[in-house]
Amino acid sequence: MKSKTMPFDAIENYIKKVHETFSTFNPFYIISGDTDLENQSSINHYRKASHLLRNLAPDCLQSYHIRGRMVELPKEIIDEIDFYMYQTGHSAKESDKEMCYQMPEYFFTNYPVKPLINSEPCYELIGYAGNMYGRFHQFDIRRAAWQSLLAGASAGITYGAGGVYSWHEYGKHFSPCIGEGFDMPHPWQIALHYPGAWDYS
């Protein structure tokens, strides 16, 4: 795990605070964010958070938000989550354009059947990942939505707008090192009005 990781012994107090603040609203708890579960230390951190929340809020559903285009999940996590979340992400490479239907197929073929969500198809007008020139437009995100749903994202899809996810503001710096090397987003005030949002509503 990278530096600035929450110490293992701080997880319990943090989770108690999360539970006290949110569990009364019956949320879905997303245990991780864009994680690749690359080593046992990472897995242990997230599993501890998951177990604590499961004991404190047994009626709240749980899942993990794994990094883009990742399909490999540790068995111990598969057995503990209530539904799968995958993200096809923001790559415009030809080899990645099939992810919207290949990833659900992988989940159905290799894991016990559970509800499935594409939690991060390409965001509208986000710059292509990998410092590639171009942006995803209304047609692209609509295609990603339909491919995901028809391929098995039975619990749904999410919509994202480049500029809203980062609350980008006029005149603010945006580092291409953030995420996968995305281009400067539009300010959130503009991104709120992207037309593709209506295709998802």
Located regions from the model:
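Short amphipathic alpha-helical segments and helix-helix/interface helices
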Residues: 19, 50, 101-108, 145
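Solvent-exposed polar/charged
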Residues: 20, 55, 109-110, 150
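Active-site mouth of glycoside hydrolases
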Residues: 1-83, 87-94
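Active-site clefts of carbohydrate-active enzymes
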Residues: 35-36, 80-91, 103-143, 167-168
